[in-house]
């Protein structure tokens, strides 16, 4: 607001206005011109940098600094100068919003700067949407008046729901793109005409200065059901093209009927279908003048048919996409240039950008190929957005239109294994994942369908293909050949990019499996991305391999029966019993087991064969070559001994000394690969550092694989061959001090479990001490394999999920409810610290426990007690009267007045501070000021009454609003809503006041107390007796203290601060008693107002 002036009359008139008149006019003009800036988003538009903030109560997070390099800033500066010049000369201001055709008014076309605005061609071609008139009028007088911010809100609402905003929202910022804003004097001769009779809206008239008010009106074009087709004065001959389009539609209709007989399952595209596409070279900006140009290249938005179809956005196919990252700029710009090399309009439409096309040609294949390439490029951009930004794209620096030798539609894309030595040793054909092209490409016709049937012949890549599979009239056209070749190059590059884009994709260098199917299956059957899962598989006979619960089978060569170990497992998404989520952990060296161990590949066997439990062993790049050769020797030995089931079983039995074979599979949770080792005798895998597993109660020492402290995630899996169903136990928390438990027997673990149960039954108010997290237990699910896994008594494994909760409560029990590091729960009571005030429970000592977690050094007084007295631990306390431990005795506490006055006047040192409270302050009366959201500093104190919780005190500082404070009406209602850190309402204070008699330069205060009074059913009593009982039994629940002052002109302000008292004890706690809340408002009486200092 303006500063107060010396003159009393001028001060009375000028003090109220929040804006200068010129600044307010500029804000309105910028809101009209920048309030609908197009952008590529769901909303489709945004407010520019120079628009006034929507909520003046909250300051903007980042203040925009104008730069001459930005066209939007230059245009805003020009608009500001024009508006201020017209306003100072007392000339009404006119802002016109219009659309221009896209054909001749693009970035390469004529600009609209300077004299071009007066060009008759522009006036003829432009479509006027809105005409705003900002006119100064004499000052409005009367009791009912409008503030400036009210007009701003009304104009913002109109702009938000305007026709232009609706078009931008439907098209996600694509159309319209050539938007022109013209600021000029509101002269009748300068006004452009509407194409239809406009509708007029007049806004409320606020006073903007001591003698001038502002009248704002807008005339707008009626709502259009369809987007208008704008044509310039040059390209208006459309009748010829309509005739040609009708002939094409008839021709395509006959072709579509023939295509159904040809068996093409893909939907037929009509060449006359509209397709609007936006090139993502940058943010879509509004073109107000030629300097404020958009950063994209304008494309033709004419439909490719002239059948009278509208440019309705609901019927149009609008595809907007952005560049994925800066690293993809080169390839993206090349794709954009390739896309721009051919116009989106049909080859028969002659304009300045497509004049090289012959208007006499009628070739539907060109239109379909153009549309297909358009969709391919759009899907490439979508895929690049979702691609891993850290992955180096293969297509970077390689344009899509480069000619390369590649198959048109490969059925399966091969890759190479990272470890080629394993591939050479493996004699079995490895399954090849089919690349999922759903996010990258979608093609129609026989060539575009990627079938998984090996018997399906490939189409001739040189033969042009149309929608019905018949040769068209344009076979010999070189444009068709170039388009087909370009499409094949795009497909090949998509495949290469997909292989390298996913860092988890395995590289297969071998013959792909022949996929046998009873029905045609598209390429979207399964994906070979191993992002989150590596699945354990079981082996069947060497002659056939089948995936469980899959609709296809992978047939391998019967002549090669040896098993191989792929470096990266094939992971079809199975929902069977073998699903396990195994995460990759980098830089972990894997030590392979000896060849004598039964480490085997895991696949499914057929139902008529005896099932074996095998596991895949995967090597990482950090493994040395000795380990790889050792693995290969082991695999060969395992393959040669594959039939000898009895020998393997006997060997395992010798180690386990039991009738049934029990295997330990301790799997490090890797992100991509798993290291699954099978331990069958003691001391075999002592180099592998993993968690300890205890097998049987009678077995004192089993195979132990130690894990270092740096390993955070290990997974324990126990598989039982008799039941043939593995029971998997996972450990997801950090392992600490595993070595302490290596030499403890089964009885010690039983004693530990008993101690845990005893501690768990302890009093809930006792603060948890530093218990060893290994001493807790966890119930195991009772399943088929759980009987044999009961012997796993190691509490490190059994209490895996609860380890993070049993640490010190200061680190783990404090949960963040709002995503910050704010402490939320109390260790003793378990109650939320940041919710609505709730008292702490009493302990057995009978004293009010001090919450040491809320103590802060800046608020902690040396006199404040910091510990509680425990009667049971203090032998001298039994013979003495017990005093309050939460506050000193009343005799030693020198209070000036009662507790309420001492707290409100800051005579007591706070015991602690609770951060995160906020309050919304508002007022209503003859006018409604802006509601302000302000922080509240909340503290609590020590009290003298035993076990009585201290009320909270909150202080709302108003100094941030200015030296005068928060302006309120002379009389009305003040509303203060208090929120806790969880944004839950604690209390809503409503205070009714009347300060119309308050003179200027005076001050006063109001205090409202809210008491909880017991409800009395007996009404027959004297008034004096009732008042005396109420004063004795009523409890103060809430209090608000308001300070008021008046300025020299008599305006009323809330100044300095607002002080609150609210109880920590919620009313719901005393739900058993019948209480009601009663409020009393008090103010000074003699004198009621005092002069300002």
From Swiss-Prot:
Nucleus as UniProt keyword: yes
Region (Transactivation domain 1 (TAD1)), start-end ranges: 29-37
Predominant location category: nucleus
Start and end residues of each stretch annotated as Transactivation domain 2 (TAD2): 979-987
GO cellular component: nucleus
Biased composition range(s): Basic and acidic residues: 746-763
Pfam families, sorted: Chromosome_seg (PF13889), DUF4210 (PF13915)
Record's subcellular location: Nucleus
Chain spans, region Required for macropage invasion: 895-952
Keyword set, alphabetical order: Nucleus
Annotated InterPro entries: Atos-like_C, Atos-like_cons_dom, ATOS_Transcription_Regulators
Stretch list, region Disordered: 396-479, 558-579, 746-788
UniProt key word Nucleus: yes
Entry text on domains: The protein contains 2 transactivation domains (TAD). Each of these domains may be required for transcriptional activation of a subset of target genes.
Similarity comment text for this entry: Belongs to the ATOS family.
Role description: Transcription regulator that syncronizes transcriptional and translational programs to promote macrophage invasion of tissues.
UniProt protein name: Atos homolog protein A
Organism: Gallus gallus
